[in-house]
Structure formats: C-alpha cells, structure tokens
Amino acid sequence: SWQLVLDKRENFRQAFAGFNVERVAKFTSNQRKQLLKNRGIIRNQRKIDAAINNARVMTKMHREGHQLCTVLTTLIPQPIVNHPQQFTNIPTQNRLSRNLAKEFKEIGFQFMGPVTTYSFLEAVGLINDHIEDCPFKYTTT
C-alpha cells in the first residue's frame, strides 16, 4: 500500500542514495543485491530493478538535454486542482495519467502505470486532490 511506502520513505531515501538519479543509475549488481537484502525497504526484485532502470532512463534524458520537469510542465502548465469532498472521491487515475503512462513506457520507464503515474503527478504538485477542508488545499511552496 502507499502507506507502507510512506512509512518506509526514509529507509528508501537512504537505500537509494538520497533519490539522486545520477547515483542510482550507476548502481552495480552488488548494490542491487544489497537492496534485495535491506529489510527497511520493500524488497521486490522487479520494483528495485525498475527503480534502477528508471534512474538510467532519467540520466539518458538529461544527457540528451531533456528534463522531466520541463516535459511535464509543458503538458500541464498549471496544476490541476480537483475538488473532492471526501477521500472516496479522489480518483486513482485519469485520462492524463493513462496517456502519460503510455508515453513513459515508450521512453523506457518501468512500473509507471496509470495509477503510479497519477500518484506521481499528485506528489510533484501537478494534481491537487486535497479534500476541500484540508489546510494544505491551496498552499503553495
């Protein structure tokens, strides 16, 4: 569940080099084996391999002069603000996340289906699904 991921966030941060894509992209097979033994993270081999792969895809994009942030903000110039009244009204995916997931797959990303892509867009602030009475609904960073 997403809560499990959030509960282990600091362990993931340590295990994946502070989420530095340049460093993760250079992980060796020995480092990968260490991740599979790390009890502080979710030890799913396919997901660990996907994380390393995705870091490599990102660094390739950077070498080619592309930034994911620029690509996303070109597609989504202003955050999408939804107005759910309760948590059960928050979608897990939408047409945008389905289309982006297809594009991510074509680029070479793994484990970035429509639900994960939607959650990613929420996490980076491009989709605001805070319920209406949430104090963070309209805050900006």
Predicted feature descriptions by range:
Residues 1-141:
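HhH-family (HhH-GPD) DNA N-glycosylase catalytic core used in base-excision repair
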